[in-house]
A protein has these predicted regions:
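Extended hydrophobic leader/signal-anchor segments used for secretion and membrane insertion
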Residues: 1-375
């Protein structure tokens, strides 16, 4: 009786959250297992009964594990330092796929454990970068919000997953001015973990070195022997606040990037001279948004036209052709996001590789399971 009440409460709770599909899936699992268990009890041969029961239990446990990893929760390893001081290389994070709704598999390679059989098949392996099925996503409990940190696949490859922070939503206009991000003309309040390169003048050297030793950030410091009272380093907002409160530095100046990154590696328009710290304005594509086809828009969005929108757009003498038809405008099929790493000078993000399509979003980071912070 208590078990039935608990199950009913769980199913009702999931329905209230809008997860009808999960409630139905759990109910289907329970009903199927109950029916099979009923027929197993009718078997008179004890050894056969135990064998079949063990096989059924194993298959249900395996199915539950596959279902959970594919649609509910999964574990990922942080591959780089792009999100320091929030995550560190080698950290194991728990990713919640229910937040934005789980993306359904687009090929057998997206299905845990089942994909092992396809990795050993040469014909299937030749199609590992292809989408076998159309993009679909089940209902989630919320939408992506500015400031969310989530895991996504960087391109159509199924081997490379990264984690970044969302600073721009579909339809937003993003502008970066002297390293500060503005969304729709409003300054984005970066979290305390965001790191930037700074120059600063020391007021109290002894206290300064004591503090940076406690913060374990001495390896980030660079000293100028010709100016002994000046130093530079990579600090998070939180670390800078500590240094300022302790009254050991006199002034701070953020290092602004001036064409230190080749233009070919950045988002750009026809006449832009954008840098990592000065860029935009950039309109993030939104599903149904229509743009004029002109040299600036073509240069800014051409990667996603062909790679994610599955539209072949060709420019000939100032005239644009979409799938062979002459057009003057284009309507986007997907929503896109603008992603940035918290380690602003130690990350490759949307400033270089462009916009992230919603179809590549895996799930929101829920927590850190194992941390390498002090290793």
């Amino acid at each position: 009786m208590i078990k039935k009440i608990l199950i009913s409460s769980l199913l009702l709770f999931l329905i209230v959250l809008g997860l009808f599909w999960l409630s139905a899936a759990i109910l289907l699992f329970i009903v199927t297992y109950s029916i099979i268990s009923h027929y197993i009890k009718l078997i008179k041969h004890s050894f056969l009964k135990k064998t079949i029961k063990c096989i059924v239990v194993f298959l249900f446990l395996l199915s539950s594990l596959i279902f959970s990893r594919m649609l509910i929760l999964d574990l990922f390893r942080i591959p780089s330092s792009s999100m320091e001081n929030l995550f560190y290389p080698g950290d194991i994070i728990v990713v919640n796929k229910l937040k934005y709704g789980p993306k359904l598999p687009r090929s057998p390679f997206d299905i845990p454990f089942i994909n092992l059989a396809f990795y050993n098949n040469k014909n299937a392996l030749s199609r590992i970068k292809s989408n076998w099925w159309n993009y679909n996503r089940l209902a989630g409990t919320t939408n992506v919000k500015r400031g969310d940190v989530f895991v996504f696949s960087l391109d159509i490859s199924r081997k490379y997953f990264v984690v970044k922070r969302c600073v721009g939503l579909p339809g937003d206009t993003i502008k970066i001015i002297k390293g500060e991000v503005y969304a729709n003309s409003t300054l984005y309040n970066s979290p305390e973990t965001v790191k930037n390169s700074c120059n600063f003048r020391l007021k109290n050297k002894k206290k300064f070195f004591t503090i940076i030793d406690s913060l374990k950030i001495e390896e980030n410091l660079i000293y100028d022997n010709s100016s002994p009272n000046w130093a530079s380093g990579i600090f998070s907002k939180h670390e800078l606040q500590i240094l300022q409160k302790m009254n050991c530095i006199d002034s701070i100046k953020k290092n602004i990037d001036h064409l230190n990154v080749a233009q070919e590696e950045l988002l750009k328009t026809t006449d832009s001279r954008w840098t990592l710290d000065d860029m935009g304005p950039i309109i993030i594509p939104k599903k149904g948004m229509e743009i004029d086809l002109n040299p600036d828009n073509f240069l800014l969005y051409k990667k996603i036209f062909n790679l994610f929108e599955n539209s072949i757009i060709i420019q000939r003498n100032g005239i644009y052709f979409i799938d062979g038809e002459k057009e003057t405008t284009y309507k986007f099929k997907l929503n896109y996001y603008f992603m940035m790493g918290d380690n602003r000078k130690g990350t490759s993000d949307s400033r270089s590789w462009g916009f992230l399509p919603e179809s590549n979003v895996i799930g929101k980071v829920q927590c850190v399971l194992f941390s390498n912070k002090n290793k």
